[in-house]
Amino acid sequence: DEVLKTEITIKDSHNALTEKTNNAVVKFDHVDFKYADGEENVLEDIDFEAKPGQTVAIIGSTGSGKSTLAKLIPRFFDVTNGKITLDGVDIRDISIETLRSQIGYVPQTGILFSGDINSNISYGAPGIDEAGIKEAAQIAQATEFIEDKPDKFESAIAQGGTNVSGGQKQRLSIARAIARNPKIYIFDDSFSALDFKTDTQLRKALKPKTKDATVFIVAQRVSTILHADQILVLDEGKLVGKGTHKELVKTCETYMQIAKSQLSEAEFAASIEGKED
């Protein structure tokens, strides 16, 4: 009942653009954000640019605003001050359908629908063929467990994915985003339910597929983002560091503390020398 009474606050502007972008350059231009019922900014003066072919990672302690930042890109919320642009156009001037059709968003907890594996992967990718579905599953490291099921890709999925494990649910959600072949990928802490080996294999397989896309990864594990082209370090909603792993361990105390708390001395040394996997 409450949902029905809630007014939709994110709406299309009067002359919203419906043409898709050629080049997914995402720019945060001095963005502040606070929730409608909040008194203080959750994000403050966030300023950066992400280009196609780049992986931009977002890291920080719990409550630092990582997921909130990611949710601003598909306009789940609107910025309070500043603006976010896609190819130089304020995303508030682009129709919501057009904007979101170019984004593959994977939340922290995978979302599945009642149906079968095929329909869950192809949801949001009209016209995708069997080969496309299988490729998406392969990249998402889901093929092995799918092939182990008696009905393979036609295996039933319960509403909410209650009949698959957390890691399997996550891999199917990632496969769905890949199947869309979007210009922008947002992985909102989507790899946390995966073991280290699967995480590594998935990111390796993902790289050639996303080479022309703009990729955002919200992460808790430093190991997930060592090779990111740009790492944004958030602390209490502020951007306290921006650069590569090797740059940030020298210039950003917050990042150095996170890295040293998660990596062994040997791993930390190898990561700076570029000898890690």
Across the structure, where does each feature detected by a protein language model lie?
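ABC-type nucleotide-binding domain
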Residues: 5-13, 17-277
